[in-house]
C-alpha cells in the first residue's frame, strides 16, 4: 500500500486564501475599532481566543448578557441578488437587538461563516457589512471563525451566525416579567 500525503489543498481547503481573508478582517477591524474602546485588545483577530477587559467599565452590579443568532433564509436572497454586505449588517442587528431589549449596552461581536469554497470578494462584502453593523451598534468585532467545508456546502452556498455580548447593571435589566407587567411591545432598532 502506497502512502499519500494528505493536505488541506487536496481536500479542497485553501489555507492561503483563508489567511488572506483573516488579514483583511484584521485590517478593517483595527481601522474600525472605536477609539474609546480601551477595553479591547486590538490584536484579537487571528488569535484563537479574543479578550475584552471589563474591569474598567463603571457599572454597579454588572451582568453580562449574551445572544447568538443567524440570518436564516436571507442568505438565499443575498445569493439571488448577489448582495452580501447587508446580511452582515443584519446579522449584527439580530444579535445586538436581543441585548438591547434586556437593557444591555453591546460590547463586542463574533461571527461564524461556513462555506463550501472561499469566494474572497463575497466574504469581503459580508465581513465589511459585519464591521459596519458593529459600528452602527457601537460594539467591536473581536473574533470569529471562517470554516471552508467542501462537500458539506456547495461551492456557492454558505451559512452565517453571530454572537454578541453586552453589559447591564442588575437594576436596569429588562426581564420578561418586567416586560409582561408593562403590557406593551418592545421594539429596538439600531
Residue ranges and their predicted role:
Residues 2-35, 39:
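N-terminal amphipathic/basic leader segments beginning at the initiator methionine
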Amino acid at each position: 500500500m502506497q502512502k499519500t500525503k494528505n493536505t488541506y489543498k487536496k481536500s479542497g481547503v485553501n489555507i492561503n486564501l483563508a489567511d488572506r481573508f483573516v488579514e483583511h478582517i484584521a485590517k478593517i477591524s483595527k481601522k474600525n475599532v472605536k477609539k474609546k474602546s480601551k477595553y479591547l485588545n486590538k490584536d484579537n483577530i487571528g488569535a484563537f481566543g479574543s479578550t475584552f477587559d471589563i474591569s474598567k467599565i463603571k457599572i454597579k452590579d454588572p451582568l453580562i448578557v449574551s445572544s447568538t443568532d443567524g440570518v436564516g433564509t436571507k442568505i438565499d436572497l443575498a445569493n439571488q441578488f448577489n448582495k452580501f454586505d447587508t446580511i452582515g449588517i443584519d446579522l449584527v442587528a439580530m444579535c445586538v437587538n436581543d441585548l438591547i431589549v434586556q437593557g444591555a449596552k453591546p460590547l463586542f461581536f463574533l461571527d461564524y461563516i461556513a462555506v463550501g469554497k472561499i469566494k474572497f470578494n463575497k466574504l469581503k462584502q459580508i465581513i465589511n457589512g459585519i464591521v459596519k453593523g458593529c459600528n452602527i451598534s457601537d460594539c467591536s468585532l473581536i473574533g470569529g471563525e471562517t470554516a471552508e467545508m467542501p462537500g458539506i456546502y456547495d461551492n456557492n452556498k454558505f451559512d452565517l451566525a453571530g454572537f454578541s455580548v453586552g453589559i447591564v447593571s442588575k437594576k436596569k435589566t429588562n426581564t420578561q416579567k418586567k416586560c409582561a407587567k408593562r403590557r406593551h411591545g418592545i421594539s429596538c432598532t439600531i
